[in-house]
Amino acid sequence: MIIGTRGSQLALAQTENVARLLKERGVETSIKIIKTSGDRFTDRPLHAVSGGVGAFVRELDDVMLAGEIDIAVHSMKDMPTIRPEGLPTVAVLKRDTPFDILLTYDGTTLDELPEQAIIGTSSLRRTAQIRRYRPDLITQELRGNIDTRLRKLKEGQYDGILLAKAGLERMGWEIDGEILSPDFFCPSPNQGTVAVVTRADPEIEAAVSGLDHTESRIVTEIERILISELGGGCTTPIGSYAELTSDKQEIHIRAEVLSLDGKEDVRIDEFIPMLGGLEKARELGHRLVEMGGKRLAEEALLQISRNACGTENSFDY
């Protein structure tokens, strides 16, 4: 079976892990690297690449539908909530750490950073959350693979950088930093989760389905349902995080939508029963819309569109 993947270090690490897991189950694979729009245009903010939605996914979907690959491995947070027919998400791997991490050259924490310190991030969500938590800090765009981002931090281009902790874990790197609490920095929906998508083929689906981790699938589906009516995908300032309680009877849900400048937000923080959790998540998603979440998401998309056209430059992404 042919596994398609992006060519970045992180994407290859994720794909090689899936290939290893399949080999343990007697499935032989080969890897085919596909260049995506998100990889080609690293000189511009991610939200400016094809609207940001599906920038790392769309080309892999296309080559799979064309029959050139059998399997695709994705960081699940990059996958739009609306997916093409005929490309089932057959496996959701066990989730890695879902939270953001702040790395600084000397170990300074977020609360200890001086005023006007420069924070690098490629995420509008993290930018908005930083602006809400520490409006005295400066946020600047940071693209590139993990190596590039760490090099820029070491060179002093930034006082700190924000990353997904899971990316460091998948690379096998142990780097000290400050794990940011989801109470203040609610992560992107499905952050820390790898999804395995296949062609709609019973033989391929059967080979891959054994990799599925039930608990991770449940919470990631909850997170996607929560934000499904908001629009904007992984590029807008939207956070959604669900975790099972220790007794597996309830799901703790956090979700939020922010304005780009971090001055306005709507938030949900509730426990819902495991039984009937999907329907309850839909109800909470509707409530998030009614509270003004959809308005904030639409305003963010409009502002992003204006910036991409060069009509406004009020946000230093």
Swiss-Prot record:
Cofactor (UniProt): dipyrromethane
CDD domains linked to this entry: PBP2_HemC_archaea
One annotated Gene Ontology cellular component of this protein: cytoplasm
Record EC number: 2.5.1.61
S-(dipyrrolylmethanemethyl)cysteine: modified positions: 234
GO molecular function: hydroxymethylbilane synthase activity
Catalysis performed (reactions): 4 porphobilinogen + H2O = hydroxymethylbilane + 4 NH4(+)
Coiled coil segments of this chain: none
Superkingdom of source: Archaea
Alphabetical list of InterPro entries matching this protein: HemC (IPR000860), Porphobilin_deaminase_cofac_BS (IPR022419), Porphobilin_deaminase_N (IPR022417), Porphobilinogen_deaminase_C (IPR022418), Porphobilinogen_deaminase_C_sf (IPR036803)
Entry's cofactor comment: Binds 1 dipyrromethane group covalently.
Keywords noted in UniProt: Porphyrin biosynthesis, Transferase
Pathway annotation: Porphyrin-containing compound metabolism; protoporphyrin-IX biosynthesis; coproporphyrinogen-III from 5-aminolevulinate: step 2/4
Broad enzyme group: transferase
GO biological process: heme biosynthetic process; protoporphyrinogen IX biosynthetic process
General function of this protein: Tetrapolymerization of the monopyrrole PBG into the hydroxymethylbilane pre-uroporphyrinogen in several discrete steps.
Further remarks about this protein from its record: The porphobilinogen subunits are added to the dipyrromethane group.
Family to which this protein belongs: Belongs to the HMBS family.
Record protein name field: Probable porphobilinogen deaminase
Organism whose genome encodes this protein: Methanosarcina acetivorans (strain ATCC 35395 / DSM 2834 / JCM 12185 / C2A)
